[in-house]
């Protein structure tokens, strides 16, 4: 009997020891249901990483390709469009999967913030809503109405309408604006970043009043200013500048997205694969004195290369999401003719161009598009 009692006590001691070991906080991975306040910082930066990297190179180039702004040698832009838009092709399916993968990460973060307490984590809460709005703007502008997932689910869900998606985006951006703080770092989401994205969203929806209100608020805040030296924004030795509202840092230790590698040829100082080039139509839109031209289009050998991502194969360049130059254009279009002409001309003068001669709403819109 004594032997059995001793054995039982030994088993209990082992079980108790195992229990203590199993109670140790996990260090390498954790399920969404097990997330606590201790995980918020890691989750937050995980979301930043997913948002920067998941779209992939073609995700960032999507609208330039589909709009005919860039093309491949010996191809017409329409050929690129037809090849890119194959329904079952990876260019389409990879983006769809990537955006919903990003959404999964954001929803996990939001659930964790709500569990830990929103008031104590308002900035992270605001960042998550900003990113969810960005994801749905990417989705709705590519596919129209898509399923709105406020929480993660493995169930099959129906597509929501385009109108529902835009309403959701507006709601998300307002939550972001209400909870974020003013910018101190262009690589972190801020109240101004949310206002800039909201201005773009309302312009897309045709709500010119709200778009103009948000754009004018940013312009008149005095926090941002147009850069006379365009190379400070996109040049080889780009620096912190007065124009950028929010950008993805694209740190080489965390990303494989190197847009410059796609745009520069191997003869370039930082090398490149030279897959895509600006079309001559786009190059012709630059005026002779346009200060953007020598930064945006760089000659390498006999090739005209896209110059905004000078890292080539050597390093990743920041990807700008919002800058005050865009906000001037949003304001000009939203205010319309004639009120928007001055905002457009302020931007044109800073880029070395003469004032627009637009004399109607249609001409102003055309000038904005150029």
What are these regions (language model features)?
Residues 125, 132, 198, 324, ...:
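Structural register within alpha-helical repeat arrays
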Residues 71-81, 215-320:
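Hydrophobic-face positions in mid-chain alpha helices that act as interaction patches
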Residues 28-34, 58-75, 146, 150, ...:
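Short, surface-exposed recognition loops and adjoining beta-strand edges that mediate ligand/DNA contacts
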Residues 18-60, 215:
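Membrane-proximal, proline-rich intrinsically disordered regions
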Residues 41, 45, 76-143, 155, ...:
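Conserved, well-structured interaction surfaces
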Residues 18, 99, 168, 249, ...:
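Long, intrinsically disordered, low-complexity segments
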Residues 1-16:
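Sec-dependent bacterial lipoprotein signal peptides
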């Amino acid at each position: 009997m004594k032997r059995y009692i001793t054995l039982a006590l030994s088993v209990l001691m082992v079980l108790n020891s195992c229990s203590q070991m199993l109670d140790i906080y996990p260090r390498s991975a954790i399920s969404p249901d097990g997330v606590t306040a201790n995980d918020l910082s890691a989750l937050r930066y995980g979301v930043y990483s997913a948002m920067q990297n998941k779209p992939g190179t073609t995700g960032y180039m999507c609208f330039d390709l589909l709009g005919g702004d860039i093309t491949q040698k010996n191809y017409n832009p329409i050929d690129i469009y037809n090849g890119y838009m194959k329904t079952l092709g990876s260019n389409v399916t990879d983006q769809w999967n990537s955006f919903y993968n990003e959404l999964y990460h954001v929803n996990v973060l939001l659930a964790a913030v709500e569990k830990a307490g929103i008031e104590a984590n308002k900035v992270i809460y605001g960042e998550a809503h900003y990113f969810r709005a960005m994801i749905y703007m990417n989705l709705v502008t590519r596919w129209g109405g898509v399923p709105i997932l406020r929480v993660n689910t493995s169930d099959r869900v129906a597509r929501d309408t385009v109108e529902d998606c835009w309403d959701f985006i507006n709601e998300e951006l307002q939550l972001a604006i209400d909870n974020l703080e003013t910018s101190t770092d262009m690589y972190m989401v801020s109240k101004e970043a949310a206002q800039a994205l909201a201005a773009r969203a309302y312009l897309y929806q045709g709500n010119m009043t709200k778009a103009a209100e948000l754009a004018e608020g940013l312009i008149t805040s005095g926090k941002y200013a147009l850069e006379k030296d365009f190379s400070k924004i996109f040049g080889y030795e780009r620096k912190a500048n007065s124009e950028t509202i929010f950008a993805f840092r694209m740190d080489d230790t965390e990303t494989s997205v190197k847009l410059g590698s796609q745009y520069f040829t191997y003869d370039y100082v930082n090398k490149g694969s030279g897959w895509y080039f600006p079309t001559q139509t786009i190059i012709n839109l630059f005026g002779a004195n346009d200060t953007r031209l020598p930064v945006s289009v760089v000659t390498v050998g006999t090739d005209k290369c896209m110059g905004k991502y000078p890292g080539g194969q050597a390093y990743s360049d920041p990807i700008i999401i919002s800058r005050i130059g865009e906000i001037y254009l949003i304001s000009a279009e939203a205010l319309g003719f004639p009120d928007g002409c001055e905002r457009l001309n302020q931007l044109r003068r800073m880029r070395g161009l003469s004032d627009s001669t637009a004399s109607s709403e249609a001409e102003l819109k055309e000038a904005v598009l150029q």
